[in-house]
Amino acid sequence: QVTGNGHVQSLAFPNSYPRNLLLTWRLHSQEKTRIQLAFDHQFGLEEAENDICRYDFVEVEDISETSTVIRGRWCGHKEVPPRITSRTNQIKITFKSDDYFVAKPGFKIYYSFVEDFQPAAASETNWESVTSSISGVSYHNPSVTDPTLTADALDKTIAEFDTVEDLLKHFNPESWQEDLENLYLDTPHYRGRSYHDRKSKVDLDRLNDDAKRYSCTPRNYSVNLREELKLTNVVFFPRCLLVQRCGGNCGCGTVNWKSCTCSSGKTVKKYHEVLKFEPGHFKRRNRAKNMALVDIQLDH
């Protein structure tokens, strides 16, 4: 119960925090009040992997009777998380660390309660749509009138573009060129376990084009010969063979990916030599009658 000012923090703050922790604080204030959080400037957790806080992170959630909204998930040490005011009189803070030790100070969050009629500051609005920041890219600052962009809506928007340049033009028409240049700038801060060599410039447009161009291509499938040939009175060796069949997530990354299925434009029949067995007595004098090398046809 929040009745005044206080704080929560990672263990041993501002010294290195322990490994393998999962801590949760649920703050509850009086009716018609809200809870305000402010992070200490000594904020430092394990760095993100590919700009996603996978390993060590602190997460803040708004709690109401009908829903739970993630206001943000933070890690790394470059930026201190913003001041947050809850939308209701309940808020949840979660801290997680994995089994990898890092020499970081952790976090300390100061909390207090405010009267419900006080509006949230513009800098606090819509933080539920942000999980981690990408260094070097200047995002449009949210305002009180900006609508919240959900992950599903953002995913649909990204699916409409084929290049990074067009995507950045859509998000930031005025600063897209600067954003594109900053996107590939190397940063000297600590990178974490998955980063060992100097960051190289990745061709995101080529990766996106390859996924769309080659997702639905022939690939090896293992088929059971008795099931494939619909034969129940014989047995084959080998029991299964590899065939080339069309498959894959053909529309991944496009707006119509759920309605897209891979289908072959052309099929060919190929012969395969296998050993066929027929049921019966396998005495030496009758063995030749029960088995034979045969050619079978399979669709590729």
Curated annotation (Swiss-Prot):
Main location as per UniProt: secreted
Disulfide bond recorded as keyword: yes
InterPro entries linked: CUB_dom (IPR000859), Cystine-knot_cytokine (IPR029034), PDGF/VEGF_dom (IPR000072), Sperma_CUB_dom_sf (IPR035914)
Glycosylation sites: N220
Gene3D superfamilies tied to this protein: Cystine-knot cytokines, Spermadhesin, CUB domain
Post-translational modification: Activated by proteolytic cleavage. Proteolytic removal of the N-terminal CUB domain releasing the core domain is necessary for unmasking the receptor-binding epitopes of the core domain. Cleavage after Arg-191 or Arg-193 by urokinase plasminogen activator gives rise to the active form.
GO biological process, one term: positive regulation of cell population proliferation
Segments passing through the bilayer: none
Keyword Coiled coil among UniProt keywords: no
GO molecular function: growth factor activity; platelet-derived growth factor receptor binding
Keywords on record: Cleavage on pair of basic residues, Developmental protein, Disulfide bond, Glycoprotein, Growth factor, Mitogen, Secreted
Cysteine-cysteine disulfides: C53-C75
Top-rank lineage group of the source organism: Eukaryota
Chain ranges of the CUB domain: 1-114
Protein task: Growth factor that plays an essential role in the regulation of embryonic development, cell proliferation, cell migration, survival and chemotaxis. Potent mitogen for cells of mesenchymal origin. Plays an important role in wound healing. Induces macrophage recruitment, increased interstitial pressure, and blood vessel maturation during angiogenesis. Can initiate events that lead to a mesangial proliferative glomerulonephritis, including influx of monocytes and macrophages and production of extracellular matrix.
Similarity section: Belongs to the PDGF/VEGF growth factor family.
Complexes and interactors: Homodimer; disulfide-linked. Interacts with PDGFRB homodimers, and with heterodimers formed by PDGFRA and PDGFRB.
Name of the molecule in the record: Platelet-derived growth factor D
Gene of this entry: PDGFD
